[in-house]
């Protein structure tokens, strides 16, 4: 975890955008995925994990991931229930992946509170094998396997 006193310098020094995503795994070992809405400029109709950009107002990567899960899916997670999985270095961003098996609330896809745009228009709980079959998925299977291994070892 990056502590609050170093947080703003971390965000400012790093020229890449910081993104955090959460892999929610239910009791049947199914993973929550969200379909990006048709209004998405880059990946309309693609399936992805809940997540998004870290804001300077977020206290940590975990706090940003938890906020994004609440904004995008209506689920609440305690930062203590998040387990770090990996960091993916993308061309213009660093994507930090967390996994959890504990959350509260019911799925409620709602517009982004800042833009009032519906970012996702559908959700489903799937196995890794089912994700492989999706033609429009941007979720790497090796990350999902790594996340499932993490929760098995807890």
Where does each model-flagged region fall?
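A generic fold-level signal
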Residues: 15-17, 26, 41-42, 92-93, ...
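Conserved N-terminal beta-strand and adjoining loop/helix that marks the start
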Residues: 12-32, 53-55, 85
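Short secondary-structure boundary/capping segments
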Residues: 14, 23, 39, 46, ...
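Short, charged/polar surface micro-motifs in flexible loops or helix N-caps
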Residues: 25-31, 39-40, 91, 101-106
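Conserved Nudix-box catalytic region and its N-terminal flanking loop in Nudix hydrolases
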Residues: 30-67
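Charge-dense, intrinsically disordered terminal/linker segments
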Residues: 1-16, 27-28, 154
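Charged phosphate-binding loop/patch that engages nucleotide di/tri-phosphates or the phosphate backbone
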Residues: 140-154
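Unchanged
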Residues: 53-79, 85-139
């Amino acid at each position: 975890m990056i502590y609050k006193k170093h947080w703003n310098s971390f965000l400012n020094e790093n020229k890449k955008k910081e993104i955090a995503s959460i892999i929610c795994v239910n009791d049947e070992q199914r993973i929550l995925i969200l379909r990006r809405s048709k209004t998405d400029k880059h990946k309309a109709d693609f399936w992805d994990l809940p997540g998004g950009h870290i804001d300077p107002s977020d206290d940590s990567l975990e706090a940003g991931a938890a906020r994004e899960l609440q904004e995008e899916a209506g689920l609440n997670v305690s930062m203590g229930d998040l387990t770090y999985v990996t960091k993916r270095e993308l061309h213009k961003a660093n994507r930090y992946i967390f996994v959890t098996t504990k959350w509260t609330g019911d799925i409620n896809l709602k517009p982004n509170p800042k833009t009032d745009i519906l970012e996702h228009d559908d959700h489903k709980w799937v196995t890794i094998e089912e994700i492989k079959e999706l033609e429009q998925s941007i979720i790497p299977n090796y990350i999902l396997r790594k996340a499932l291994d993490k929760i098995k070892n807890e």
